[in-house]
Amino acid sequence: MAAPATSVLSRQVRSFSTSVVRPFSKLVRPPVQVYGIEGRYATALYSAASKQKRLDQVEKELLRVGQLLKDPKVSLAVLNPYIKRSIKVKSLKDITTKEKFSPLTANLMNLLAENGRLGNTQGVISAFSTIMSVHRGEVPCTVTTAFPLDEAVLSELKTVLNSFLSKGQILNLEVKTDPSIMGGMIVRIGEKYVDMSAKSKIQKLSKAMRDLL
């Protein structure tokens, strides 16, 4: 059953890609590959928006779409599975017209509605945001500590993390607190992961002790 579903998805994405990229002969590959249904739509949208030099505009519009879908009235009108697809398409057309969205964003939302993929909208927005983050040279970094960091330590941490970046890259840092790690920190930067938490050290010590017994 997976193959037919994949085939249908491929046709849907090609339809979207053709509808928005028709004036151009070549597709623009995104700087990072995103996967799944959402990734395919986001990739096609990135290619089209890049060709038309509307990446920033489309990104802002998609964020606005995300906000609109959090509105209970809008969500009920377009995400309710019991509402006819044709009604959802009409509702979305009214919304995109009212918001004065570009044809790129309007076409995306229309196609998602026609193909019964509106439930994937937030995923498409997230995938597009990931592509745009890499497009801008941003390197995602998450640091988890047991307790909040003071300004001096945070400043020193940023200096150390920035030293690992290449020229033109921008650190996109998110600091979280999780008392369960007990102390130390866990750092995830790009595709690298370093666990320096006290919890991890205790677990390793415990394992080493068991191995000796």
From Swiss-Prot:
Task: Name the major location.
Answer: mitochondrion
Among Pfam families, the record links this protein to: OSCP
In-chain residues carrying the UniProt-annotated modification N6-succinyllysine: K90, K100, K158, K199
**UniProt short sequence motif SIFI-degron, positions renumbered to this chain:** 5-23
InterPro entries reported in the protein's UniProt record: ATP_synth_OSCP/delta_N_sf, ATPase_OSCP/d_CS, ATPase_OSCP/dsu
Q: How is it modified after translation?
A: In response to mitochondrial stress, the precursor protein is ubiquitinated by the SIFI complex in the cytoplasm before mitochondrial import, leading to its degradation. Within the SIFI complex, UBR4 initiates ubiquitin chain that are further elongated or branched by KCMF1.
| Coiled-coil zones | none
According to the UniProt entry, its GO molecular function terms are: estradiol binding; protein-containing complex binding; proton-transporting ATP synthase activity, rotational mechanism
Provide the tissue specificity.
Answer: Expressed by the principal cells of the epididymis. Detected in flagella of epididymal sperm (at protein level).
Query: Which Gene Ontology CC terms are recorded?
Result: cell surface; mitochondrial inner membrane; mitochondrion; plasma membrane; proton-transporting ATP synthase complex
Range of the transit peptide: 1-23
One example of a Gene Ontology biological process annotation: cellular response to cytokine stimulus
User: Where is this protein found?
Assistant: Mitochondrion; Mitochondrion inner membrane
Q: Keywords on this record?
A: Acetylation, ATP synthesis, Hydrogen ion transport, Ion transport, Membrane, Mitochondrion, Mitochondrion inner membrane, Transit peptide, Transport, Ubl conjugation
Please tell me whether the keyword Mitochondrion is annotated for this protein: yes
N6-acetyllysine: modified positions? K60, K70, K73, K100, K158, K176, K192
Q: What does this protein do?
A: Subunit OSCP, of the mitochondrial membrane ATP synthase complex (F(1)F(0) ATP synthase or Complex V) that produces ATP from ADP in the presence of a proton gradient across the membrane which is generated by electron transport complexes of the respiratory chain. ATP synthase complex consist of a soluble F(1) head domain - the catalytic core - and a membrane F(1) domain - the membrane proton channel. These two domains are linked by a central stalk rotating inside the F(1) region and a stationary peripheral stalk.
How this chain assembles, per its entry, is:
Component of the ATP synthase complex composed at least of ATP5F1A/subunit alpha, ATP5F1B/subunit beta, ATP5MC1/subunit c (homooctomer), MT-ATP6/subunit a, MT-ATP8/subunit 8, ATP5ME/subunit e, ATP5MF/subunit f, ATP5MG/subunit g, ATP5MK/subunit k, ATP5MJ/subunit j, ATP5F1C/subunit gamma, ATP5F1D/subunit delta, ATP5F1E/subunit epsilon, ATP5PF/subunit F6, ATP5PB/subunit b, ATP5PD/subunit d, ATP5PO/subunit OSCP.
Family indicated by similarity: Belongs to the ATPase delta chain family.
**NCBIfam families tied to this protein:** ATP_synt_delta (TIGR01145)
Name of the protein in question: ATP synthase peripheral stalk subunit OSCP, mitochondrial
Q: What is the species listed in this Swiss-Prot or TrEMBL entry?
A: Rattus norvegicus
Organism lineage string: Eukaryota, Metazoa, Chordata, Craniata, Vertebrata
The record's gene field reads Atp5po
